[in-house]
Amino acid sequence: MIDYERSNTTKNINTHHHNPPPSSSSSDLLPDGNGTAVTQKRKRRPAGTPDPEAEVVSLSPRTLLESDRYVCEICNQGFQRDQNLQMHRRRHKVPWKLLKRETNEEVRKRVYVCPEPTCLHHNPCHALGDLVGIKKHFRRKHSNHKQWICERCSKGYAVQSDYKAHLKTCGTRGHSCDCGRVFSRVESFIEHQDTCTVRRSQPSNHRLHEQQQHTTNATQTASTAENNENGDLSIGPILPGHPLQRRQSPPSEQQPSTLLYPFVTNGSIELQLLPSRNCADETSLSLSIGTMDQKTMSEVEKKSYEKGETSLEREEARRETKRQIEIAELEFAEAKRIRQHARAELHKAHLFREEASRRISATMMQITCHNCKQHFQAPAALVPPPPQTHCTDESTSLAVSYMSSATTEGEKASDRASS
């Protein structure tokens, strides 16, 4: 394992605490009113108050910046945690006696202090109880080497876990406050909301905005009811026991009919919507709007129809192109097949030619007379090679003709020599 620098002397945190907290490893017995002993429940120690009996370890900055703190003594593979190293050792299948620690050694808990003198965690009273924690703290606060850089926002991180957490929220708004600040961590966002001044002044403004919005909605509802289809409704408070009544107006009257309700005399608010005086103007306006809507709809339908035709033409052209590509691929495959067949025929013709020449040479070697052999070698060289389409029978007949001529000439030469 890699050696690490400890403090010159093993410090006891009891000397730095005025009132040391009780140890979490021991359970105190408190007497109750009857004198019986009651076991005190163990409480979790708050952050920054380590165990007073723990061993204080001070590591050098070089050791804290190392990526692999624990190294296997068998294969020299490094790990960041001791638990990972112990799990790795089991894979080597080493006998348990070699891995078992000596029972005489007393295992003490260790706490780690920051080597930076100006840091809060340099004091043993605020030491960190985890090696990974002190390494992350030193890299975040006291190291300028930011190894992991975000490709989107070019923000650098010295700790890989912080970089991975940033990647999950990078490119999004994250947790945004009303003051404009954006937080990637929920904890930081909650802490900021507790101290944000903009959020405190928001409820009163929000209530005022709700009141204004409620008034606006009521006004819009009244104006919408005035522009209804009939234009002759008069809405008032309906009292129980009084049915709705409609007054029938003669045809000569131009005013539209209204609904009559008994009015309330106790001073309550009455919402009464009367028809507008310019009823003819409203009718003409609605007709003109309807005409414009029809024109707009016709234009939209025409454009959509043109777009549909264009899309159909494009689809048809795409299909035709695809069909032509398939035909070209088939023709190319057929051409490749014809070429391979032609190559095979040419190879067969070459083989036939070589076989014929070999047989002719073998026949000429059987002639015993040296003069005749030289005499017939020259005409054989001048004979053109057989065409590629000749078969084996033609080459054989040619070789037989050469043999017969050679035999005849040999007999004539022997007769001359004997005479």
From Swiss-Prot:
Q: Does the keyword Kinase apply?
A: no
* Entries under InterPro entries matching the protein: C2CH-3rd_BIRD-IDD, C2CH-4th_BIRD-IDD, C2H2-2nd_BIRD-IDD, IDD1-16, Znf_C2H2_sf, Znf_C2H2_type
Primary role? Transcription factor regulating starch metabolism by binding directly to the promoter of QQS. The IDD14beta isoform attenuates the transcription factor activity by competitively forming heterodimers with reduced DNA-binding capacity. Regulates lateral organ morphogenesis and gravitropic responses. Has a redundant role with IDD16 in directing leaf and floral organ morphogenesis. Involved in the establishment of auxin gradients through the regulation of auxin biosynthesis and transport.
Q: Which PANTHER family match?
A: PROTEIN INDETERMINATE-DOMAIN 14, SERINE/THREONINE-PROTEIN KINASE RIO
Tell me what gene encodes this: IDD14
Query: Which annotated residues bind Zn(2+) 2?
Result: C177, C179, H192, C196
**Protein name as it appears in the record:** Protein indeterminate-domain 14
Which portions of the chain have biased composition (kind: Low complexity)?
213-230, 246-259
Annotated GO biological processes are: floral organ morphogenesis; gravitropism; leaf morphogenesis; positive regulation of auxin biosynthetic process; regulation of auxin polar transport; regulation of DNA-templated transcription; regulation of starch metabolic process
**Which segments carry the region annotation SHR-binding?**
185-197
Instruction: List ligand-binding residues for Zn(2+) 1.
Output: C150, C153, H166, C170
Origin: domain of life: Eukaryota
Expressed in which tissues: Expressed in cotyledons and the vasculature of reosette leaves. Weak expression in hypocotyls and floral organs, but not detected in roots and inflorescence stems.
Question: Major place of localization?
Answer: nucleus
Which ranges of the sequence are coiled-coil? 313-349
What is written about domains in the entry's comments?
A: The coiled-coil domain (311-350) is involved in dimerization.
Q: Where are the zinc fingers (CCHC-type)?
A: 175-198
Q: Where in the cell is it found?
A: Nucleus
Q: Give the induction note.
A: Not regulated by auxin.
**PROSITE patterns in the record, alphabetically?**
ZINC_FINGER_C2H2_1, ZINC_FINGER_C2H2_2
